[in-house]
A protein has these predicted regions:
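C-terminal beta-signal and adjacent terminal beta-strands/loops
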Residues: 38, 638, 662-722
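Transmembrane beta-barrel wall of Gram-negative outer-membrane proteins
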Residues: 178-215, 227-274, 294-311, 315-317, ...
Length: 722
């Protein structure tokens, strides 16, 4: 439900565009005020009978958690993604993205009752389905399904395929102060069917999610007594074209046989440049000019496929995934004095190649109605190859290489699991899974001594249940044993040219293991009004955090046990019941705490950078009798400090993020939307405390604080279909 599900599209400040935005808001608000002056009875009658400019009535209340296509007509959706986002109280989760393998449930989206293939992004998959092809969307409970790992709310999108060629497109021009406009951000999707009915379906997407951004900032440096001794005025710009293409194929060669193939390729051509003037305050000396740059020419290829067919009294399914990523990057930094000239420069180059291959087989059968079994086996291979080189240039010298270093990190993994789903009564459903994982983790310095592989055997599994108190109130509980997914870059050393906060390699790193528990209460009050609260906790062993290595090394490693707990609230409030037709308020609020013993000083603290509080409140008004909609949002994310060997960092925003939007749903058949972000003019901040040695032995040397001023951001969007 959040309006921030897609990357923000930054834009700027044309006065006529901004005035047009607020003019639309004023007109829409005037219509709203006039409508609010009517009696409640009249408003309720309008909610049932009045047709808007789109010729659609206010959405009827869904029956039996099924949302027919006409429920969404008021919003004039273009894709299935637009429809799912308007389901009260529902949140899309990506599931396996960033998790270990394919056997942990996946995204909470089904298409015609089927799980998405491999690690397919549900946002991309839904955006490729035309809204007019959607028959209905039914909210189901994961514990009642025969899909291992799914729990909580699951959206099952029923799609009616068609042979006709259809397409959707969107264009998102971006404008922003002091930056060139970004005019190429957009997406085009073509879909249809070839051959006889039920034959080959296809969806082809071409897109560019490129962005440009920039800010000006002033950084202050103070000594241990709080005395300002240096200021730094910085101006930076960055951006990245992200062209890509995706192809999705579905094939039904004969009844009960299904095949899917998804392939996606995209580039990420990032560049960043920053110029700063460093001015001493308490000491004599010249200003220093610094220049830093970063670039990356990344390409990504993702492919996944599956084939499902009946065997004996059950169904056998094979799934394959291939991910490849190449990421050559560079970082540079130089210092110059206006009086004495060049002072020094450095450059750090890195070439990284990442590979993931997964194969999985699942066999499922149902011996009786409502009782499902599945046995699964999965194998995976992950690998990271990295080559790095540091270059230095001193006054009067040339750029000289400091030696090439190379690393390889790989993991072979196999797992097997047995999953069972069944009702335990007319109101209680249960799903349980037990499994075991074997993995072999190896790391090596290709330019130095080899490191032998380490082998692990770990249990995995979960128990998930749903108790249906009545037709509108569900209680869900889940207990899971999870093995974490490592970031292979954490094994590898890294160089920080600007701040001199380098990372040491650590080949002893192992995945964390966790016991996860949650209880969720989900209440539907009718007419689209929902409230859901989830309480959760985790006990983590082999916690991945920052650890000391040797006498002065700072690396990513394992620090023992940690605890994490919190609650999440998601609620939708529709205004129709209170005489405000077409209005809705969506609320998300998360609170979290965590505890781990600091590896240097032993005191309890939060996990590094862990979430503390996050909220997102979105208001929307689809004005009855018109094609206009308007609204806005406020949101914020507050995270904990990050502890390193010689420093403590914290970053965030000094107030809530804010936005206003106005939308017209039918301008010559197109949907036009203007959104003004950062209405309150917030600034991002970064704070750092540096010590003159390790935190356990040194004292505070200095504190640093910087604030980035981005200004207002205006985004335009034009959407159409054919």
């Amino acid at each position: 439900m959040s309006i921030f599900n897609r990357p923000l599209l930054a834009a700027t400040g044309s006065p006529c565009l901004i005035s047009g935005l607020f003019a639309g808001l004023i007109v829409s608000q005037a219509v709203s005020v006039t409508a609010a002056a009517q009696t409640v009875d009249t408003l309720q009658a309008d909610a049932r009978t009045t047709e808007g400019g789109t010729g659609q009535t206010v959405p009827p209340a869904p029956a039996d958690n099924a949302y027919p296509a006409d429920y969404f007509a008021l919003y004039v959706p273009r894709t299935a993604l637009d429809m799912v986002r308007r389901i009260p109280g529902f949140q899309i989760t990506r599931g396996d993205t960033g998790r270990r393998g394919l056997g942990q449930g996946g995204a909470n989206i089904l298409i015609n009752g089927e799980r998405l293939t491999g690690k397919t992004d549900p946002f991309d998959q839904l955006s490729q389905i035309q809204a007019e092809s959607v028959v209905e969307i039914r909210i189901r409970d994961g514990a009642t399904l025969s899909i291992p790992g799914l729990s909580g709310q699951v959206a099952d999108v029923t799609v009616e395929r068609t042979r006709a060629l259809k397409g959707t497109w969107e264009w998102n021009p971006q404008f922003r102060r002091r930056l060139e406009p970004n005019l190429t951000n957009g997406e085009l999707t073509l879909s249809g069917e070839l051959g006889e009915a039920g034959g080959l379906t296809y969806a082809l997407t071409l897109r560019d999610y490129g962005f440009r951004s920039g800010a000006r900032a002033t950084e202050t440096l103070r000594n241990a007594d709080g005395v300002l001794f240096e200021t730094r005025d910085e101006d930076f710009q960055n951006g990245a074209p992200q062209p890509g293409a995706a192809l999705n194929l579905g094939w039904t060669p004969r009844p009960d046989h299904k095949a899917n193939l998804n392939a996606e390729y995209w580039q990420f051509n990032f560049s960043r440049s920053a110029r700063a003037v460093r001015t001493p305050v308490t000491s004599a000396g010249d200003d220093t000019l610094t220049f830093s740059g970063r670039g990356e020419d990344e390409w990504n290829l993702e492919m996944d496929a599956d084939y499902e067919f009946p065997v004996l009294s059950g169904t056998l399914k094979f799934i394959g995934v291939l991910d490849r990523e190449s990421s050559p990057t560079f970082n540079s930094f130089s210092r110059t004095s206006p009086r004495t000239g060049f002072l020094g420069a450095s450059r750090f180059d890195q070439e990284a190649e990442e590979t993931e291959v997964i194969g999985r087989a699942e066999y499922g059968w149902s011996p009786s109605e409502g009782r499902d079994w599945q046995i699964a086996a999965e194998g995976a291979f992950n690998e990271l190859d990295v080559e790095q080189q540091l270059f230095l240039r001193r006054p009067g010298g040339v750029l000289e290489g400091q030696g090439l270093s190379a690393f390889n990190v790989s993991e072979d993994r196999a797992e097997a699991s047995l999953t069972h789903s069944r009702p335990l009564g007319p109101r209680l459903d249960l799903q349980a899974s037990a499994g075991v994982e074997y993995s072999s983790l190896s790391q090596s310095r290709l330019t130095g001594p080899q490191t032998e592989a380490r082998e692990f055997v770990r249990p995995k599994g979960f128990v998930s249940s749903t108790y249906k108190v009545d037709d509108s109130f569900d209680i869900r509980a889940r207990l899971e044993r999870e093995v974490g997914q490592l970031n292979f870059f954490d094994f590898v050393a890294a160089v920080d040219l600007e701040d001199n906060l380098n990372r040491t390699s650590n080949f002893d790193l192992v995945p964390s293991q966790s016991w996860l528990g949650s209880v969720e209460f989900d209440k539907d009050f009718g007419d689209g009004n929902t409230f859901r609260i989830e309480f959760y906790g985790a006990v983590i062993s082999d916690t991945v955090d920052r650890i000391p290595v040797g006498t002065d090394g700072d690396a990513v490693g394992n620090i023992g046990k940690a605890h994490r707990y919190g609650f999440d609230i998601v609620s939708t409030i529709k205004g129709d019941r209170w005489g405000l037709p077409g209005t809705e308020l969506n609320i998300e609020f998360d609170w979290r705490d965590s505890s781990v013993d600091d590896p240097l000083l032993g005191f309890p603290r939060r996990l590094n950078g862990d979430k503390e509080i996050a909220y997102d409140v979105e208001y929307r008004h689809d004005v009855t009798g018109t094609d206009w909609a308007y609204g806005g949002s406020v949101s914020r994310f507050i995270s904990a400090e990050r502890f390193r060997l010689f420093s403590i960092d914290r970053n965030g925003v000094d107030g809530p993020n804010s936005s206003l939007f106005v939308e017209h749903k039918d301008v010559a058949g197109l949907t036009l939307r203007a959104t003004l972000f950062n209405v309150l003019g917030n600034e991002e901040f970064f704070e750092r405390t540096r010590f003159d040695g390790r935190r356990d032995a040194g004292i505070v040397r200095q504190t640093e604080e910087i604030k980035y001023n981005f200004g207002p951001i205006l985004s335009l969007s034009v959407e159409g279909s054919f």
